[in-house]
Amino acid sequence: MKKNIYIIWCLLLYAISTQAEVKLPGIFSDRMVLQRETPIPIWGWAEPKETIVVDFNGKQYKTRASKTGEWSINLPEQKAGGPYELKINQTSIQDVYVGDVYLCSGQSNMELTVKRVMDKYKDEIMSYENNLIRYTKTKYAYNFIAPQENSENEWKTCNRKDALDFAALCYFFAKEMQAEKEVAIGIINSSWGGTKIASWSTRQSLEKYENFKEKFRSSQYSNPDYPDSVKNAQQAQVSQWHQRQAADDLGSKEKWIHESFDASDWEEIDVFNSNWGGSRNSPLNGVHYFRQRINIPESLAGQKATLRVGTLKDSDATYINGVCVGRTSYQYPP
């Protein structure tokens, strides 16, 4: 009896040890696209020395994790196709295609979403869906001390709902590429508006340039508290600016936004002429108030409406009869 119990116990231990899960980068997830006709790198983390078994497209591949748990393997070249299951030990990734993968990076122009160009392209966007276009946007994350090994990603297919959150440039590029290549198209959007490329470069690459060498000689860049000190100083400056603006803004004090305010002595201007505000060729910096009276026919009373005021740079707030109906705090609309 003791012998039987011993054998069963050993078998249970063996079964558990072979089912240990691996950890994968966020980019490896359902609906992903792998690059065709080139070796496919797969990597991740596991228990030290653990055996890694990869099943893909009817074949199996094996490797072993290092002493510190990292592992990687290159799958052989694949032709375009899918959908497939990519299984790594007990982790299963579904609806995987092989096609062409593009990395899109940049600043705000690369982040501008489809929903913000709907005024011009609504009919085209609402009439198009394509399961062979897959998109993922790397979520915001940063580390001022060391490079990150992982990112948070979710792959989405090109349907009328999810496409609204695609970057517009990526969306139209993917449509064109899919029509031309007739294979699955994967778009990895790794962009962050307003950030400089140096922010995402390694120290080794930046040290090739003299101006960065000088910066790295300063001890502040190796101080983990330095980023927070910069952030706090900037927040204090912004707070002080808003306090001064509130104290000095005559329009705010005298309630110029209210319907009852008498603006009969205000100057009439042409907003399409850049000389208004007392300056040549460009308006004066500061806070400007504009008032315009419009008549709404009774037949439209109570209905939804869109007020189009054009591009207002850098920021604005719009009031109707003293009620704020919209504002922009972003200097590059739409």
Residue ranges and their predicted role:
Residues M1-K23:
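Bacterial Sec-dependent N-terminal signal peptides
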Residues W43, W266, I294-G322:
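Aromatic-lined ligand-binding clefts that engage carbohydrates, nucleic acids, or primary amines
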Residues G58-G81, T311, Y319-P334:
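Beta-strand-rich ligand-recognition modules
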Residues T63, T91-D100:
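Edge beta-strands of extracellular beta-sandwich domains
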Residues G81-Q90:
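Short, aromatic- and glycine-rich surface loops/edge beta-strands on solvent-exposed regions
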Residues D100-V101, N130-N131, E180-G186:
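Loop/turn elements at helix/coil->beta-strand transitions in domains of secreted/extracellular proteins
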Residues N150, E154, C158-D162, P224-A305, ...:
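Extended carbohydrate-recognition surfaces in non-catalytic/accessory domains of CAZymes
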